[in-house]
A protein has these predicted regions:
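Hydrophobic structural segments
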Residues: 1-106
Length: 106
């Protein structure tokens, strides 16, 4: 069975983390590296609607270009889109990987 870690290893061969700009937050954002994966949703941005669609579709992993966590995190609450998205991903057991500047450079 394919696991999140298997896909992350493959992605690292395409877009190595060391290619990311220093200010960027590319890479594994959230989730369980050991979780099994049968469906992957690909999106430009990790919006709340994206997380909801992944949950409805039964995806265990989302791959995005832009990261969910970009600015320093001060809190994760229902009052922000990032907080609501993170909560939904955690509740549904969905992992998130973002390939931003490392993917741009690759």
């Amino acid at each position: 069975m394919t696991r999140v870690s298997d896909i992350l290893t493959f992605l690292e061969t395409i877009a190595p983390q060391d290619l990311a700009m220093d200010w960027d937050n590319s890479g594994f954002q959230l989730g369980d590296r050991n979780a099994p994966v049968t469906r992957v949703l690909v999106s430009l941005d990790p919006f709340e609607d994206t997380a909801r669609e992944a949950a409805e579709w039964g995806a265990e992993l989302i791959l995005t270009h832009h990261p969910l966590f970009f600015d320093p995190i001060k809190s994760i609450t229902e009052e922000t889109a990032v907080g609501r998205t993170a909560r939904l991903l955690i509740q549904k057991g969905i992992s998130l990987w973002s390939g931003h500047t490392n993917l741009d450079v690759a």
